[in-house]
């Protein structure tokens, strides 16, 4: 089990990937403890004073002007959680919920939500016991935070709802007992602090960012293999071309193609042929994939900032004793980042689909029609390409930005919302579709490279070819093809092909202790 020490405000992408996908145990930086205590004391003092403060002794949303008497403050927080637990749809995945828990813990531990350490310890207890609250995936509009899904997560602390433990579906009371916890009574503001925030949108976007990073690296490998399968030129990857444009992602993508294709015997065999220019799907790969890379890097930066943010409302400032209402719960940054990732994922798949079309077209590729030597009685990759085209078309619709939509809610008090949760959630389908398109391309490109025998591709890509053939044999006559596509797609999603790509992302680099973090902030800035 991997131990991850949470440093609120200074989490890294590598830590977030580890938390989501590894068997990890969370610890909290001790410097958080006095900060949390000061925030909780500030809220308790306001509650005792009777001074009106939103979320502490008032109603919520359009009911914010309603004063709540002291003897109903605990009931107010409980009712808030119960009334907001109205999510629908399939439950969020275990990696997503683990990340939601970690992000919520980190946000609360910065001391500006005014909750007690007891509440944070309960969330840590759930995580470390392997308890995964059952959180429906639909029902949030991304402002005021991810209310409905976070209410389902929070209800578990009250002994209400359901969870998963070791794959078993159990009631909340049993889940709490497994974690060594009893149902809690929430203090002033604690229910609101649990529900307010962008942690669900952010966790969804991060989990799918990590999937799209794997897809991107796989696409570089598949695209390079297709260059050799189509007997394409290496000249478009020359560093001098890309330096003149200066786009960072393009420069990095071109360098990756050069590394992947270095030493190709196929290229040497046709280096002096009369072909002048390849189709764009081969020649412009650095430009298209580089633009995707720049989008992904920007989205990752935005999401990392949000993962370290306090997106609660109102916010507690212990130094001045103030509680300030704002709008940090609005998910627009997450929605924009997710929409940018959607564009990148769709374009990765669109370019791969075009390369498949090129490979099966004998006129363009110089290979046998549909990549099978005895065409006619055999249809080869004809309909596998149709599947890729169908998925690429779906991706175009899924790439439509969710953030441009808004519906007013809460009697027009919440009159503009981000739709960040949907923007982040649909990335999963985009990543999955694109992984399947790439599986088909890898199979087609492997077929094309083998049809170039006796010439061989580069040493790096020969290893990729060996991986493909360890799962799926050469296609010489028609056979039941769906299991082959599924087998390679599983390897794509698991990162087996991405590991052959020399380019990597920040989330895949193991943090080098404190060197990977910004300077340690003082307690008040945690």
UniProtKB/Swiss-Prot annotation:
Keyword Cytoplasm on entry: yes
Entry GO CC: cytoplasm
Keyword NADP annotated: no
TM segment ranges: none
Residues carrying 2,3-didehydroalanine (Ser): 144
Reactions that this protein is recorded to catalyse: L-histidine = trans-urocanate + NH4(+)
GO BP annotation list: L-histidine catabolic process to glutamate and formamide; L-histidine catabolic process to glutamate and formate
GO MF, any single term: histidine ammonia-lyase activity
PTM field: Contains an active site 4-methylidene-imidazol-5-one (MIO), which is formed autocatalytically by cyclization and dehydration of residues Ala-Ser-Gly.
Crosslink site: 5-imidazolinone (Ala-Gly): 143-145
Pathway assignment: Amino-acid degradation; L-histidine degradation into L-glutamate; N-formimidoyl-L-glutamate from L-histidine: step 1/3
UniProt keyword list: Cytoplasm, Histidine metabolism, Lyase
Matching Gene3D superfamilies: Fumarase/aspartase (Central domain) (1.20.200.10), Fumarase/aspartase (N-terminal domain) (1.10.275.10)
Top-rank lineage group of the source organism: Bacteria
Enzyme class, first EC level, given as a word: lyase
InterPro entries xref list: Aromatic_Lyase, Fumarase/histidase_N, HutH, L-Aspartase-like, Phe/His_NH3-lyase_AS
Enzyme Commission number(s) from the entry: 4.3.1.3
Pfam short name (any one): Lyase_aromatic
Localization, UniProt: Cytoplasm
Family that this chain belongs to: Belongs to the PAL/histidase family.
Record protein name field: Histidine ammonia-lyase
Organism in which the protein naturally occurs: Aromatoleum aromaticum (strain DSM 19018 / LMG 30748 / EbN1)
Encoding gene (name): hutH
């Amino acid at each position: 089990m991997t131990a991850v020490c949470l440093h609120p405000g200074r989490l890294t992408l590598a830590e977030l990937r580890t938390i989501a996908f590894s068997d990890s145990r969370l610890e909290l930086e001790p410097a958080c403890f006095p900060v949390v205590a000061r925030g909780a004391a500030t809220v308790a003092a306001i509650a005792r004073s009777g001074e009106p403060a939103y979320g502490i002794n008032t109603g919520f949303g359009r009911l914010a002007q309603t004063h709540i008497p002291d003897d109903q403050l605990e009931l107010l927080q409980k009712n808030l959680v119960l009334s907001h637990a109205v999510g629908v749809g399939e439950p969020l995945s275990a990696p997503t919920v683990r990340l939601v828990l970690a992000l919520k813990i980190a946000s609360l531990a910065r001391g500006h939500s005014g909750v007690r350490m007891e509440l944070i310890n309960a969330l840590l207890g759930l995580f470390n016991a392997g308890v995964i609250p059952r959180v429906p995936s639909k029902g949030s509009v991304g402002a005021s935070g991810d209310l409905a899904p976070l209410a389902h997560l929070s209800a578990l602390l009250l002994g209400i709802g359901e969870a998963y433990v070791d794959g078993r579906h159990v009631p909340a009371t049993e889940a709490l007992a497994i974690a060594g916890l009893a149902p809690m009574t929430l203090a002033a503001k604690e229910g609101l602090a649990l529900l307010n925030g962008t942690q669900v949108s952010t966790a969804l976007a991060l989990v799918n960012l990590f999937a799209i990073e794997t897809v991107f690296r796989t696409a570089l490998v598949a695209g390079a293999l297709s260059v050799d399968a189509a007997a394409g030129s290496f000249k478009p990857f020359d560093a001098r071309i890309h330096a003149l444009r200066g786009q960072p992602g393009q420069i990095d993508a071109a360098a990756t193609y050069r590394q992947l294709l270095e030493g190709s015997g196929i290229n040497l065999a046709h280096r002096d042929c009369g072909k002048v220019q390849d189709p764009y799907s081969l020649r412009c790969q650095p430009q298209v994939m580089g633009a995707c890379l720049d989008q992904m890097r920007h989205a990752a930066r935005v999401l990392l900032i949000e993962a370290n943010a306090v997106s609660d409302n109102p916010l507690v400032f212990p130094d001045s004793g103030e509680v300030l209402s704002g709008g940090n719960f609005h998910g627009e940054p997450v929605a924009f980042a997710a929409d940018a990732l959607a564009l990148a994922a769709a374009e990765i798949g669109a370019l791969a689909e075009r390369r498949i079309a090129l490979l099966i077209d004998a006129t363009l590729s110089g290979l046998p029609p549909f990549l099978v030597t005895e065409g006619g009685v055999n249809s080869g990759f004809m309909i596998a390409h149709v599947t890729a085209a169908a998925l690429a078309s779906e991706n175009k619709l899924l790439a439509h930005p969710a953030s441009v939509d808004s519906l007013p809610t809460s009697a027009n008090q919440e009159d503009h919302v981000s739709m960040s949760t949907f923007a982040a959630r649909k990335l999963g389908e985009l990543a999955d579709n694109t992984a399947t398109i790439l599986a088909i391309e890898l199979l087609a490109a492997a077929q094309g490279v083998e049809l170039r025998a006796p010439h061989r591709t580069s040493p790096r890509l020969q290893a990729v070819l060996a991986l493909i053939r360890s799962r799926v044999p050469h296609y010489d006559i028609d056979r039941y093809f769906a299991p082959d596509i599924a087998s390679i797609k599983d390897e794509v999603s698991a990162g087996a092909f991405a590991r052959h790509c020399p380019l990597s992302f920040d989330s895949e680099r193991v943090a080098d202790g404190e060197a990977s973090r910004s300077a340690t902030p003082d307690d008040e800035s945690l």
